[in-house]
Amino acid sequence: VGNLLISSLALEKNGYDIFRKYPALFKASYAMLKYSFPNLTVSAFGDTGRASQSAESLEIGLLGAVKYNQAELPEMLASMKKLIDGGIYDRKKSGFLGLLCYMPEIPEAKTNYQWPRTGTLEFARFFLQRNGTDPKTGLMVGVQGATYNHNHCNGMAMELYGLGEVLGI
């Protein structure tokens, strides 16, 4: 998704309304945080590695949200604040892409990020439930069981989060 978003950024900068034409691509720029454990990492979905919300993707999405006056802008700003406050992202290290393409300043988030207590990633058949969002005291369970999405040969995968760690898979 990251490379598609970078390509979309180039097209947007040259007058093509890619995010308006393909709203799912815009939504992909900020989707991962809502599936994250309280330590800001995402489920391994069976056999993949652990990732987190891409700050680069979120920066590109913020450009689209501002340009098209999207209702998601406050949530996206709160997501970016969460990544910066959590030590996941430092804008000073965004390189040439950040220097040449990102907004000069990120507008101040007026709200904190609101973690959904429960959620579903439908295509992956991933279901989550949280109890608290503090990285040390929060709890979360994620269960995934799609037949085509990185699952183990033994069927369903479950991850438990507590005490700041993913405790099982």
Question: What does each model-found stretch correspond to?
Answer:
Residues 2-169:
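Extended polysaccharide-engagement surfaces of secreted carbohydrate-active enzymes
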